[in-house]
UniProtKB/Swiss-Prot annotation:
Belongs to the pantothenate synthetase family. The gene is PANC. It catalyses: (R)-pantoate + beta-alanine + ATP = (R)-pantothenate + AMP + diphosphate + H(+). The lineage of its organism: Eukaryota, Viridiplantae, Streptophyta, Embryophyta, Tracheophyta. This is Pantoate--beta-alanine ligase. Homodimer.
Amino acid sequence: MAAPREPEVIRDKAAMRAWSRRRRAEGKTVAVVPTMGYLHQGHLSLISAAAAAASADPVAIVVTIYVNPSQFAPSEDLATYPSDFAGDLRKLASTGVVDAVFNPPDLYVRGAGRRGAASGGAISCLEEAAGDGHETWVRVERLEKGMCGASRPVFFRGVATIVSKLFNIIEPDVAVFGKKDYQQWRVICRMVRDLDFAIEIIGSEIVREADGLAMSSRNVHLSREEREKALSISRSLVDARTGALKGNTDCKQIKNKIVQTLTETGGQVDYVEIVEQESLVPVEQIDGPVVICVAAWFGKVRLIDNIEIDTRS
């Protein structure tokens, strides 16, 4: 285990780009772990994946901490998203492997014009607050539809845009994303492929609490009772995988069972979908690599989780 050390905090875009270029000139692989802060063990596992990403070359690890307003709709929880920058720095220092933290005050041009919808007709917290200052958006047209994209129409547009901006600023060789946000991971993979970013995207496995709850910064908002009820998500996913591996591969039956379980435990289901792992195309029968994706509300907290299944293995 590496000895604890303080990472350098960088807030300026030009300084961040220059830092990365110096590290690359030194023969290092630059790896980035994008986060919105309020770090937990799941985030630290992404850092471990970044540290292991370059076996041949030394690696310089950048963690970004930036709560991106363009991926939140005005009705969503931007204002209450948890934050503890000092605590985050302590956690990052404890790993001993993080070289820099990119924590910009803002990454968007702020306009003073009228409020209005940008391309696609969707309005985010950014547009509501800043008018038409920012006008350029990155969209992954098909993969952003359905699942989280159905109930959060600005989300993936905001994610793809901010990640593109971070990639252009940091110029990493490697970027690590958690597979808990499965659709987001696939959207980023497709964006990198389609736009010819010379970046390796690593998907890191879900990290769970001892009782199975997927780690999330939003878990802090759950009451004790809500948290106990929320365990029905991971338990229903494990049951579904167990059943599928035993031959229960009818997707309609599987989805209905998960919805029933979550509803009976007090959850409000946003969606349950079974899709091909790479294309995210819904399937009716499990006969290859699929992922079951779930989003549900417990109290005022929206939680997502998923489980990969391959009945061929």
